[in-house]
């Protein structure tokens, strides 16, 4: 891992350097880090750069060090994807990170039950409610799991908690769990503008769709294959990995689509950029999505997106301007076909998607989260100095931070 860049000097000496503890089921180095990992990585990199200290407690995975330190960042890895929750609670209760100023609890369908045991000021980050995810992955068993692990804890324990989420749709879903909307803040995900940008010369010569993300059942990638099957002469780049890959490989053979799909598996950041630039349309058909990070990343490369109209995707895509939304697979296939067949429409959507992506930056996202964390800290400690990084910054908003600088090894 490379050394971290030195912290930026605050424009005011009257500011505090915080120690932020993150509780998450996985960190950004995990092979299944996904959008959660990207979000945490981007924000943590900036908090460190602004002079703060960050500790993360997350699950372990094969080959991961139990403790990893770089500069003011410490990653603690305990338990597996299921056992990380009791392990993290027990280890933190015993004082693993005794001096945190504020806690960011990341809830990906399972809570850490922090209202029962955590006395440090805290904020709960929920990307999206996972009920549909549970049902899609586990059927009837998933309904019971969602009730026990997500629905009941949120309704019974978290009513007085402060929440952060990434779209209005997710905010509404959280509020439906009995949380006062006034306690829910929204901060859209950003884009690394220095890492993504258009290159018309890199566009594929033949009509090309791109799906980029984890290969999970709830992502409903079979619907992407439906769209492909209804549009002859189109190629699909399928980038990412996950436990649904074998089923998708079998589906390709069963449908006779193998020759029209390039299965890439995990891809590097460099390859991700190439795929975004090659694609004519970026497509996602997930059953649960808080925002749609691939939508804004593709947009930064002037590639329009297509999706089913649900969750945060209906906010990430401005239908008819930066991409297309549909209410069912048949309509999605028809709209995608129209975009692929009309170069003027496709170029107009791509230009608008690029302009829209420029409205989002990780600096803004990281600062908004830090504001909320600091507000909870100062509410518990009246008179405390504000956190460094909340005053006007001296560097360009949206500047990219090298992923290796915070130990990132995560492909898509």
Question: Could you describe each region identified by the protein language model?
Answer:
Residues 142-163, 172:
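Membrane-proximal helix-turn-helix segments that form the acceptor-binding/catalytic region
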Residues 164, 200-231, 237:
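Conserved donor-binding/catalytic core segment of Leloir-type glycosyltransferases
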Residues 169, 190:
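Carbohydrate-associated surface elements
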Residues 249-267:
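Nucleotide-activated donor-binding/catalytic signature segment of Leloir-type glycosyltransferases, i.e.
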Residues 266-267, 274-279:
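Short alpha-helical donor nucleotide-sugar binding micro-motif in glycosyltransferases
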Residues 287:
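Aromatic "clamp/platform" in nucleotide-sugar-dependent glycosyltransferases that forms part
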Residues 295, 304-307, 317:
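Short hydrophobic beta-strand element within catalytic cores of glycosyltransferases
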Residues 319-330, 338-344:
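Conserved acidic donor-binding segment of nucleotide-sugar-dependent glycosyltransferases
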């Amino acid at each position: 891992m490379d050394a971290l860049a030195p912290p930026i000097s605050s424009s005011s000496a009257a500011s505090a350097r915080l120690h932020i503890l993150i509780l998450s089921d996985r960190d950004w180095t995990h092979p299944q880090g996904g959008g959660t990992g990207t979000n945490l990585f981007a924000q943590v990199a900036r908090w460190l750069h602004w002079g703060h200290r960050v500790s993360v407690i997350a699950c372990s995975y094969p080959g991961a060090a139990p403790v990893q330190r770089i500069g003011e960042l410490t990653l603690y890895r305990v338990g597996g994807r299921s056992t990380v929750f009791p392990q993290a609670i027990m280890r933190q209760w015993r004082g693993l990170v005794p001096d945190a100023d504020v806690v960011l609890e990341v809830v990906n369908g399972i809570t850490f039950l922090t209202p029962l045991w955590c006395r440090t000021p805290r904020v709960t980050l929920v990307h999206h409610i996972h009920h549909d995810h549970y049902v899609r992955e586990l059927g009837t068993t998933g309904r019971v799991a969602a009730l026990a692990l997500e629905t009941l804890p949120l309704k019974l324990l978290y009513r007085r908690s402060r929440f952060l989420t990434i779209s209005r749709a997710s905010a509404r879903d959280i509020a439906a769990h009995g949380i006062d909307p006034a306690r829910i803040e929204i901060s859209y995900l950003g884009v690394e503008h220095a890492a993504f940008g258009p290159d018309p010369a890199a566009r594929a010569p033949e009509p090309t769709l791109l799906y980029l993300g984890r290969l999970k059942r709830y992502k409903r990638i079979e619907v992407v294959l439906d769209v492909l099957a209804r549009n002859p002469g189109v190629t699909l780049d399928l980038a990412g990995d996950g436990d649904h890959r074998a089923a998708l490989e079998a589906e390709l053979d069963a449908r006779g689509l193998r020759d029209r799909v390039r299965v890439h598996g995990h891809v590097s950041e460099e390859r991700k950029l190439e795929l975004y630039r090659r694609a004519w349309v970026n497509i996602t058909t997930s059953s649960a999505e808080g925002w749609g990070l691939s939508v804004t990343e593709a947009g930064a490369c002037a590639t329009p997106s297509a999706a089913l109209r649900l969750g945060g995707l209906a906010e990430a895509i401005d239908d008819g301007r930066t991409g297309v939304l549909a209410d069912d697979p048949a309509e999605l296939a028809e709209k995608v076909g129209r975009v692929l067949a009309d170069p003027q429409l496709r170029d107009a959507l791509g230009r608008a998607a690029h302009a829209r992506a420029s409205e989002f930056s990780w600096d803004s996202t990281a600062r908004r989260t830090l504001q909320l964390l600091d507000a909870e800290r100062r509410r518990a400690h009246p008179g405390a100095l504000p956190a460094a990084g909340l005053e006007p910054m001296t560097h360009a908003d949206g500047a990219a931070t090298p992923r290796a600088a915070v130990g990132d090894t995560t492909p898509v």
